Amino acid sequence: MQWLRAAHLVTLGFNTDVGMREDQWEPVTVDNCDKVRGPFYHGTKADLSIGDLLSPGFPSNYDEGRVLNHIYFSSLLEPAIWGAELAVAFATSGERGRIYIIEPTGPFEDDPNLTNKRFPGNPTKSYRTQKPLKVIGVLNDWQGHAEADIHRMVEALQDLKRRGRAIIED
C-alpha cells in the first residue's frame, strides 16, 4: 500500500472521520503487533496458490527498478483492492488483479507512508513487514473500482513521481 498517500483517502472512499484524537491511537510496532487481528489482505498482479509465500526483496509494482525491503498488507479490503488494481495498471497487462488472504509469518508495523500523515493514526489499517506473508486464501469475489477512477489514480501517482514527491519510505 506504499503507493497510497493520505491526501487520497477521502477520494478513495475511506472514512477519515475516525473520531480519534492523536493521543488515543496506539501505534502498531513489531513489539505489539500480536494485538492486531485479521483477516489480512494483499492485492497484487501475481498468480499465487494457497501456501505460497510473498516475500520482500522483489521489485516494486509501483516504482520501476526499485527493490523493496518490506511487503505491505492491510486488515481492510479497500487498500488491497487498490493494490491489485494498480499493480495490474502499472504492468499494463489488462488482466484482473488478485487479492489474497494472508497471514504474517513474523512481526509487522504500521505502514509509515500512511500512518499519521493527513489523519491521525492508521485509518487504512495498512502494515508492512520484512518477513514473508503466507497465502491462506484467495478472494475471488470482490468489487473493483471504475476504470476512470483507476486511470485518475495512476495519473495522480505518475504526476507525484514527475514532481519528485513519490517518495516511498521503505
State what each model feature region is.
Residues 3-5, 18-22, 35, 45, ...:
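Active-site and NAD+-binding cores of ADP-ribose-processing enzymes
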Residues 77-91:
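Short active-site loop/helix that positions an aromatic residue
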Residues 3-71, 85-86:
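ADP-ribose/NAD+-binding catalytic cleft of ART/PARP-like enzymes
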